[in-house]
């Protein structure tokens, strides 16, 4: 297990300088913490995003805005290097055993977020998804394997193979919102998406983003269209927790409608108004959009 210490008030993974510098020079892992910060910043600044915090408004949220997201990103970004460090240090153990090794880092990262935001959950889903991805990247680099979209997603799937069974199927009581939604609707949420190797991202979002950019769309237009693709296909538990299965059906059908033809920003603004009126926030899709943007910058295979 990583040795956790508290230098200058920040929890970190204790690794020898030689080991850390060895893999930080790998071409496949340059400044991964900065890459994550860029992806998270891209997501919050992208506008207009129906129901979500952006530069135009706070979406269906009363307790957060762009400034709070930026504060949160600044607080959590250094931790993603710790996930990568831990993956590299434990490259000699099977992926199935790796999740338990990085849980303390995830908990500490969440605490850093909550401390910075005064208790507001801005990035819990992002910490979970990007923490897994960074751990996988370090593990692959430590084994001398290529870091690609496929190897990253396959590694996360192997890490989380038993996550749904261990934390949802065998749960005797609904202690968390995710457990409640699984028991009531059979939705596996972020755990299921990770256990699938981010299947929604790989099957829908990445192809949509690649196709849009290949067709000449600018990054913002391509990302907005990709967000609609995610909203149309992702069984977003953030939406269900606010609006039930009817709310999810509303979001998915609305997104599908807007995907017919070129991207219409005025139609996106109207969708934003509709989701705000119904208090629906597709936060799970927002997390997956940021993840898609990060993965897009790695080779496919």
UniProtKB/Swiss-Prot annotation:
Cited Gene3D superfamilies: Triphosphoribosyl-dephospho-CoA protein
Catalysed reactions, as listed in the record: 3'-dephospho-CoA + ATP = 2'-(5''-triphospho-alpha-D-ribosyl)-3'-dephospho-CoA + adenine
InterPro entries per UniProt: CitG, TriPribosyl-deP-CoA_syn_CitG
Pfam short name (any one): CitG
E.C. number: 2.4.2.52
Record's signal peptide: none
Molecular function GO terms recorded: ATP binding; triphosphoribosyl-dephospho-CoA synthase activity
Annotated keywords: ATP-binding, Nucleotide-binding, Transferase
GO biological process, one term: prosthetic group biosynthetic process
Family indicated by similarity: Belongs to the CitG/MdcB family.
UniProt xrefs under PANTHER family: 2-(5''-TRIPHOSPHORIBOSYL)-3'-DEPHOSPHOCOENZYME-A SYNTHASE, TRIPHOSPHORIBOSYL-DEPHOSPHO-COA SYNTHASE
UniProt-recorded name of the protein: Probable 2-(5''-triphosphoribosyl)-3'-dephosphocoenzyme-A synthase
Provenance organism: Pectobacterium carotovorum subsp. carotovorum (strain PC1)
């Amino acid at each position: 297990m990583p040795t956790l210490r508290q230098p200058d008030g920040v929890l970190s993974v204790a690794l020898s300088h030689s080991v850390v510098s060895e893999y930080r020079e790998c071409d496949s892992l340059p400044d991964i913490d900065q890459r994550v910060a860029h992806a998270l910043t891209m997501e919050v600044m992208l506008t207009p995003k129906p129901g979500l915090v952006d530069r135009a408004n706070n979406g269906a949220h009363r307790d957060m805005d762009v400034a709070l997201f930026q504060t949160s990103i600044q607080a959590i970004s250094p931790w993603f290097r710790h996930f990568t460090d831990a993956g590299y240090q434990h490259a000699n153990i099977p992926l199935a055993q790796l999740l338990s090794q990085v849980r303390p880092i995830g908990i500490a990262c969440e605490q850093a977020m909550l401390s910075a935001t005064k208790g507001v959950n801005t990035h819990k889903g992002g910490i979970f998804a990007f923490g897994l991805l960074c751990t996988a990247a370090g593990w692959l680099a430590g084994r001398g394997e290529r870091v690609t979209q496929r190897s990253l997603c396959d590694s996360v799937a192997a890490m989380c193979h038993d996550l749904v069974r261990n934390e949802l199927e065998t749960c005797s009581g609904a202690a968390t919102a995710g457990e409640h939604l699984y028991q009531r609707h059979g939705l596996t949420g972020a755990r299921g998406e990770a256990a699938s190797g981010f299947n929604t991202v790989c099957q829908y979002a990445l192809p949509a983003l690649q196709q849009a950019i290949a067709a000449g769309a600018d990054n913002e237009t391509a990302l907005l269209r990709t967000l609609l693709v995610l909203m149309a296909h992702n069984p977003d538990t953030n939406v269900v927790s606010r609006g039930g299965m009817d709310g999810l059906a509303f979001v998915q059908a609305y997104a599908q409608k807007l995907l017919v033809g070129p991207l219409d920003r005025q139609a996106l603004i109207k969708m934003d108004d509709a989701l705000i009126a119904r208090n629906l926030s597709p936060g799970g899709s927002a997390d997956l959009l940021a993840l898609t943007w990060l993965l897009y910058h790695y080779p496919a295979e």
